[in-house]
């Protein structure tokens, strides 16, 4: 949606007019105007997506009941009704998954810092740089990459993430499904950050065209959280998780030695407890070093039993695609 907001509704790679015309990006003079354009793009894309999802859910409820799923919900058993029909309250299984929130926050923070505050370039120059994947604009690219980033306990970017998510959530939660059930929202990108990134152009946060978006759902973009795990958890906790009714996914990879003693394990447990007290949601760890993962890529026959946490599920590392392996390796704390 941010790409559409910064390109007057046009998808960069295809050149198609996918969203409404929300204004020449060169005319934006402050962050509020960009966020308003983003919201318009989000709302325009949500309506047809919701219509499709309603049709999908209606078919499930009337033609393809799911007794196995129903067996896990007491209300379905009590009512004798399907999960996708009227079996559960107050939701009917429809969730809007948000992917790339940290990229959005990083991008808006970079625009605020580099364009509006430092005036290192104007919006027209930024728009042209994005269109050409920063060809010939390496200095501007570096300045955008040096701007504040999500995951470092910095209010100037963390509160942008909170604000964008709040506005999107408030819009989604006004809607209802075909059987009058409330819609839910969650930062649960799973592993779609890789294919989604492939169809997107460059972004103001310094991500180049075709590169993956931030993974998991709410995890900082790889390599940008440079202030330690406590800063990561503080950034994530600033987001109002009460609006994330379907939760969020935070992936963290730390060295195995971080839990090599009982004292270290207790410290990690205390860290997680504080995160939960701050109303953080799902956090999952990989306790494996970079050297081990890189060696597993080179010699998969030696690591057939190497399990890693992907996104709410675990898998054998050597069975994952190279792109997903690289994404897991790039995770940091």
Residue ranges of predicted features:
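Internal maturation/activation junctions in enzymes
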Residues: 53-60, 81-86, 118-214
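Structured mid-domain segments that build the active-site/substrate or prosthetic-cofactor binding neighborhood
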Residues: 1-141, 214-333
């Amino acid at each position: 949606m941010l790409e559409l907001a910064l390109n007057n509704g046009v998808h960069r790679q295809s050149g198609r007019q996918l969203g409404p015309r929300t204004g020449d990006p060169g005319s934006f003079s402050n962050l509020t105007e960009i966020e308003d354009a983003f919201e318009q793009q989000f709302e325009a894309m949500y309506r047809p997506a919701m219509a499709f999802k309603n049709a999908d859910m209606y078919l499930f409820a009337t033609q393809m009941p799911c007794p196995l799923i129903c067996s896990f919900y007491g209300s379905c058993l009590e009512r004798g009704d399907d999960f996708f029909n009227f079996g559960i309250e107050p939701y009917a299984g429809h969730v809007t998954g948000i992917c790339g929130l940290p990229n959005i926050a990083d991008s808006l923070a970079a625009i605020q810092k580099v364009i509006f505050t430092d005036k290192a370039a104007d919006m027209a120059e930024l728009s042209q740089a994005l269109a050409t994947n920063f060809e010939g604009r390496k200095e501007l690219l570096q300045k955008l990459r040096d701007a504040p980033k999500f995951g470092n306990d910095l209010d100037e970017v963390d509160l942008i993430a909170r604000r964008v998510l709040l506005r999107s959530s408030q819009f989604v939660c006004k809607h209802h499904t075909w059987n009058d059930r409330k819609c839910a929202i969650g930062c649960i990108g799973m592993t779609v950050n890789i294919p989604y990134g492939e169809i997107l152009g460059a972004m103001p946060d310094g991500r180049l065209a075709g590169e993956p978006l931030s993974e998991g759902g709410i995890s900082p973009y790889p390599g940008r959280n440079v202030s330690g795990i406590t800063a990561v958890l503080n950034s994530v906790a600033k987001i109002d998780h009460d609006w994330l009714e379907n939760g969020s996914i935070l992936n963290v990879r730390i060295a195995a030695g971080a839990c090599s003693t009982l004292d270290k394990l207790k410290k990690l447990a205390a860290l997680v407890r504080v995160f939960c007290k701050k109303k953080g949601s799902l956090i999952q760890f990989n306790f494996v070093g970079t050297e081990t993962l890189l060696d597993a890529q080179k010699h998969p026959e030696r690591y057939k039993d190497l399990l890693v946490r992907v996104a709410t599920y675990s898998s054998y590392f050597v069975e994952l695609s190279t792109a997903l392996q690289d994404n897991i390796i790039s995770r940091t704390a």
